[in-house]
């Protein structure tokens, strides 16, 4: 077959190729080990010395022509494939965007943030402390005697006789009073642990305690601040009562109730004036300084604010429940 005919045949097959695989078959047919041009090169040995150089040059020129045609068609096919892919993946910018559903704060986190915001505006700073506490900071310094029920094994998680998971964040107040001098205004949010589990109790829950120590601090100050806090937190006018109670670390002590929508009183927090023995335990003179303290269960406040009946729902990570608080 003459070279012109081979070139024409190759060009025809190259033009007809619709994909890279077919184009490669054309390359093999004409320039592979057993290709038509390769066979012609092998036949050069049969020619005379005078004919061989000119014939070899013509075969190589034909090979270059076919190779250039294959390269050009290959580039065309790659461009065509890319354009096709881009067209398939094209985004219609005139369509409205697909919005992602945003996450949201856990209801307990929301409550803690609301509490911190309110008391922060009154000059209270946020303090934290260890969740593994010793007996002095968890009990002794708080005027809780050795025979108090709170110190029993069935209420407290002990590591050894003097180390335990804290049962309240009051230890943070003790550590703050040891480290800083009055005047003091602090709140201490955090996790606390008690050996209890039912519809209204879990072994771990969140608590916020507050402390104010200064000269001439009175129960009237405590009552006014808590009254304003509850109205601010629930965002409605509430009937509030302070009911006499007993806590080892405060004297006098009170529990604060709000009137529920069902016409019944609901306990929301405990409070009182810091007991002189607590001030003495941290080296503060109770003759010079007085103070008040209060404590509230975060989950309980959250339940009341959002109408949740089972405290355990806060810890089950059910998205159907949590999405209600967006």
UniProtKB/Swiss-Prot annotation:
CDD domains: PheRS_alpha_core (cd00496). Keywords: Aminoacyl-tRNA synthetase, ATP-binding, Cytoplasm, Ligase, Magnesium, Metal-binding, Nucleotide-binding, Protein biosynthesis. One of its GO terms (cellular component) is cytoplasm. SUPFAM superfamilies: Class II aaRS and biotin synthetases, tRNA-binding arm. Its EC number is 6.1.1.20. It catalyses: tRNA(Phe) + L-phenylalanine + ATP = L-phenylalanyl-tRNA(Phe) + AMP + diphosphate + H(+). The keyword Nucleotide-binding applies. Transmembrane segments: none annotated. Its cofactor is Mg(2+). InterPro entries: aa-tRNA-synth_II (IPR006195), aa-tRNA-synth_II/BPL/LPL (IPR045864), Phe-tRNA-synth_IIc_asu (IPR004529), Phe-tRNA_ligase_II_N (IPR004188), Phe_tRNA_ligase_alpha1_bac (IPR022911), Phenylalanyl-tRNA_Synthase (IPR002319), tRNA-bd_arm (IPR010978). The keyword Nucleotide-binding applies. It is found in: Cytoplasm. It is an enzyme of class 6 (ligase). Binds 2 magnesium ions per tetramer. GO terms for molecular function: ATP binding; magnesium ion binding; phenylalanine-tRNA ligase activity; tRNA binding. Gene3D superfamilies: Bira Bifunctional Protein, Domain 2. One of its GO terms (biological process) is phenylalanyl-tRNA aminoacylation. Belongs to the class-II aminoacyl-tRNA synthetase family. Phe-tRNA synthetase alpha subunit type 1 subfamily. Tetramer of two alpha and two beta subunits. This is Phenylalanine--tRNA ligase alpha subunit. It comes from Alteromonas mediterranea (strain DSM 17117 / CIP 110805 / LMG 28347 / Deep ecotype).
């Amino acid at each position: 077959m003459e070279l012109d005919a081979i070139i024409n045949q190759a060009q025809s097959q190259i033009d007809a190729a619709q994909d890279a695989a077919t184009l490669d078959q054309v390359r093999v047919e004409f320039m592979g080990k057993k290709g038509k041009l390769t066979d012609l090169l092998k036949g050069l040995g049969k020619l005379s010395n005078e004919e061989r150089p000119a014939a070899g040059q013509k075969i190589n020129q034909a090979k270059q022509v076919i190779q250039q045609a294959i390269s050009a068609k290959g580039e065309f096919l790659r461009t065509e494939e890319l354009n096709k892919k881009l067209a398939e993946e094209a985004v219609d910018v005139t369509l409205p965007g697909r919005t992602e559903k945003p996450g949201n704060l856990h209801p307990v986190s929301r409550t803690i943030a609301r509490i911190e915001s309110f008391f922060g505006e009154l000059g209270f700073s946020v303090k934290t402390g260890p969740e593994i506490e010793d007996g002095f900071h968890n009990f002794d310094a708080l005027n809780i005697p050795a025979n108090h029920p709170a110190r029993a094994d069935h209420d407290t998680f002990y590591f050894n006789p003097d180390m335990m998971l804290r049962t309240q964040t009051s230890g943070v107040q003790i550590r703050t009073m040891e480290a800083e001098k009055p005047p003091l205004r602090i709140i201490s949010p955090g996790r606390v642990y008690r050996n209890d589990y039912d519809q209204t109790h879990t072994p771990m829950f969140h608590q916020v305690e507050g402390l104010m120590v200064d000269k001439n601090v009175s129960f009237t100050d405590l009552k006014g601040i808590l009254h304003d806090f509850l109205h601010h937190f629930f965002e409605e006018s509430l009937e509030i009562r302070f009911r006499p109670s007993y806590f080892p670390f405060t004297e006098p002590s009170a529990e604060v109730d709000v009137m529920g929508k069902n016409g019944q009183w609901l306990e929301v927090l405990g409070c009182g004036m810091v007991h002189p023995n607590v001030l003495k335990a941290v080296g503060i003179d109770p003759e010079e300084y007085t103070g008040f303290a209060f404590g509230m269960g975060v989950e309980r406040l959250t339940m009341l604010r959002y109408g949740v009946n089972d405290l355990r729902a806060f810890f089950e990570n059910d998205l159907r429940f949590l999405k209600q608080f967006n």
